[in-house]
Amino acid sequence: SIPPEFTKMAPKNIGFTAGIESNLVPPAWLAKCSEMDLLVVTSQHAATGFKGTIHVQHPETGEKVAVTYGKPIQIINYPIKNLQAEDMSAKINLDTDFNFLSIAQWGPRKNVDNMLKWFVEEFQNDEVGLVLKTSRVKNNLADRQMCSAMIKSLAEKFPNKKCKIHLLHGTMSDEEIHGLYKHPKIRAYVTTTHGEGYGLPLFEAAYSEMPVIATGWSGHLDFLCIEKMTPKGKVKRESLYEKISYSLEPIQKEAEWPGVLDPGTKWAYAKENSFKKAIRKVYQNISLFERRAKTLSD
C-alpha cells in the first residue's frame, strides 16, 4: 500500500510500504506516516526518502516550511521465494543462443523504449537476443498486439539487424518466471529503470545466480552489493552487478502523478554509452559475470 491509504486502527499502528522510486516523498505521505508508530519500508532508498527533509510552500503565507518525518523506520527486504523453477526451455524456443532478460511494465518509469533502442543499436551486427516480459496496462490480446507493434516499429528502423527482441506477454506463474532465470539461453538480466522501491525481478534474478546489469541508483542496491571488511577494519560496499552510469534529473512530465510522483522530484536517467558498454562487456565476459553472480547469491 501507499501512505495515503494508512489508517489508525489500534493503539499501536504499523505502516508498510515499498516507498518511492524517486528521490523525495510527497509531503502528504509524511503527514500520514506520522500517524503510525512504526514505518516499515523495503529498502534503504525508501528509508532515505522518508528521512529526508521536504520544503513546501505554506498555503497561507507563501513561505517555505520544512516538513520532516521523525518516527521510527525499519527496513525489511523481500524474502527469497522457496519454489521449484519450471523448465522453460521447451516452452520458449529461442533461436539466439545468448539472450538478455528484462521484466518490466512498459511505462515511463521502466525506461523500456530507450533500453530496446540502445540494445538494437549495440547488437545490430550480433546474433544476440533480448527476452522482454512486459505489458502496457493489461495482460490481454489488445495489449499484446500494442507491445508487438511497438517492437516491430523499432525493428523496421534496422532492417539488416542480426539481434532479436523476443516478446513475452501474459500471465506467468512464479515457477515459470523463475524458469526464465534458469533458461540455458538466457544469460543475464538488464534494466534501465529510472528508479525502484526495491526491484523484485532484479532480486529474483540475483538470488537465481543470474548476472545483473542495472542503473546504479535506488532500491535494488540493497541486494546487488555486499559489505566487506577492509584490512584497516572499515566496512566497504562492493558492487557485484554491472553498473549503468546515470544522472539524477527531474521526472518526465508524463510520469508526474500528483501526490505520488510530484513535479520537481528526481530519478535516475541511465546513460546511453554506459548502457551499451555494460551489455557488451557482459556479453563478451559472461563466465566472469556468472562467477560474480554466484558470489552475490551465496
Mark where each language-model region is:
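Nucleotide-sugar donor-binding and catalytic loop/hinge architecture
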Residues: 83-99, 122-126, 291
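Nucleotide-activated donor-binding/catalytic signature segment of Leloir-type glycosyltransferases, i.e.
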Residues: 141-180, 187-188
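Acidic donor-binding loop of glycosyltransferase active sites
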Residues: 179-197, 207-210
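Short hydrophobic beta-strand element within catalytic cores of glycosyltransferases
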Residues: 211-214, 224-225, 231-237, 242-243
